[in-house]
Amino acid sequence: MPRRRRRRGSSGAGGRGRTCSRTVRAELSFSVSQVERSLREGHYAQRLSRTAPVYLAAVIEYLTAKVLELAGNEAQNSGERNITPLLLDMVVHNDRLLSTLFNTTTISQVAPGED
């Protein structure tokens, strides 16, 4: 008996499938639509591929998770209950890769470091 192929995205019985956002499809927490809007409003390029906002949202989510993980570990080690801007600044400057990435970034409420 031949198998019937289901159409991609259909939920059967001729009905439409549930719509699924690009953020959900990519399994991200950061909104792909928000990233795309920021890219378009910033006029960074004349054209924008469909995958560029997805990729950038994934990179931003990864960097945020990494910084928060390091700051959370540092907060636990120092006996603090909250992640403060000072902890974020310290974590970014103590990590070699993050330090080179954010070397020109100023974190609000933190005095500039003396190098």
UniProtKB/Swiss-Prot annotation:
Belongs to the histone H2A family. PANTHER family: HISTONE H2A (PTHR23430). SUPFAM superfamilies: Histone-fold (SSF47113). Atypical histone H2A which can replace conventional H2A in some nucleosomes and is associated with active transcription and mRNA processing. Nucleosomes wrap and compact DNA into chromatin, limiting DNA accessibility to the cellular machineries which require DNA as a template. Histones thereby play a central role in transcription regulation, DNA repair, DNA replication and chromosomal stability. Nucleosomes containing this histone are less rigid and organize less DNA than canonical nucleosomes in vivo. One of its GO terms (cellular component) is nucleus. Residues 1-21 are annotated as: Disordered. Residues 87-115 are annotated as: Docking domain. In contrast to other H2A histones, it does not contain the conserved residues that are the target of post-translational modifications. GO terms for biological process: heterochromatin formation; mRNA processing; nucleosome assembly. GO terms for molecular function: DNA binding; protein heterodimerization activity; structural constituent of chromatin. This is Histone H2A-Bbd type 2/3. The nucleosome is a histone octamer containing two molecules each of H2A, H2B, H3 and H4 assembled in one H3-H4 heterotetramer and two H2A-H2B heterodimers. May be incorporated into a proportion of nucleosomes, replacing one or more H2A molecules. Present in mature sperm. Keywords: Chromosome, DNA-binding, mRNA processing, Nucleosome core, Nucleus. The docking domain is responsible for the weaker heterodimerization with H2B. It is found in: Nucleus; Chromosome.
